[in-house]
């Protein structure tokens, strides 16, 4: 039986594509393994998926671009993670390793290359993260969501592979209950803060609940169960799975962070959106770059977190609603998306 090892983690964005691909390989008779951190979100997501995947936990350390005494300890963690991954590779002898990035992916990628296992990696953002910059040196091939510099000879631009589609599905019963609390004469605004929610969105909704619910139906994916609420014109919930796409479809506008997975999901269903990217003080600036790219393409509006107020947000919402057809036409004309089926066929072809 052919074997494939997946890796990637730290955030849901570094796991999502793996979760989409693994069932395809299982259906085709592959034995699927995953290398990650048992305390990480990758392990949680695989357990929730119920997929027939063997999980191997390794030591992992954070890769920092700045000086920290923790770097010294984490160098040893990464080194031990490489040794652990090497033993896993030599024991399994897989046909390939597929990496979605994140700090946990570096040891398996290095170990795979050392043991002669072909390495395929995927980069979602406009600029490569530190983990994938390291992984690229050991990779057989990299697939990218955005076009990359021509000097990166191992990169193939494939566009975004998303978990949502423009196909309409039956409404879940829970959605009917949510809609019964909404005023259908008002536009619906969905706040999405990534897998852990976004405190800045949660605070905005909390501080301006009265004003917001007078003018909009508000859906707030919070990442915090203590904020859960279903009341007049308001639905706040910590986490959703099956409701994710139905809520996307219900919304007239989405207010989101600038993670590539989410904004390309919005592009896939031509949904109006305002991007509030994580600032450089909290990230390497990849979300700022992603947001600027989408604004330049005419897909979205952006708003820096430091400028986020009720007034500034409402100005963006009003602009999008009044120019709805223009934004949707540009999104529908985009050629930057790839179906899961097409990407899977491309990957299988490259593996052969």
From Swiss-Prot:
SUPFAM superfamilies named in the record? UDP-Glycosyltransferase/glycogen phosphorylase (SSF53756)
* Keyword line: Cell cycle, Cell division, Cell membrane, Cell shape, Cell wall biogenesis/degradation, Glycosyltransferase, Membrane, Peptidoglycan synthesis, Transferase
Catalytic activities: Mur2Ac(oyl-L-Ala-gamma-D-Glu-L-Lys-D-Ala-D-Ala)-di-trans,octa-cis-undecaprenyl diphosphate + UDP-N-acetyl-alpha-D-glucosamine = beta-D-GlcNAc-(1->4)-Mur2Ac(oyl-L-Ala-gamma-D-Glu-L-Lys-D-Ala-D-Ala)-di-trans,octa-cis-undecaprenyl diphosphate + UDP + H(+)
Say if the entry is tagged with keyword Phosphoprotein.
Answer: no
Question: Which GO cellular component does the record give, naming just one?
Answer: plasma membrane
Does Repressor show up as a keyword for this record? no
Highest taxon, organism lineage: Bacteria
Task: From the Swiss-Prot or TrEMBL record, state where the protein is found.
Answer: Cell membrane
Q: In which pathway does it act?
A: Cell wall biogenesis; peptidoglycan biosynthesis
- Give the protein family: Belongs to the glycosyltransferase 28 family. MurG subfamily.
What name does UniProt use for this protein? Answer: UDP-N-acetylglucosamine--N-acetylmuramyl-(pentapeptide) pyrophosphoryl-undecaprenol N-acetylglucosamine transferase
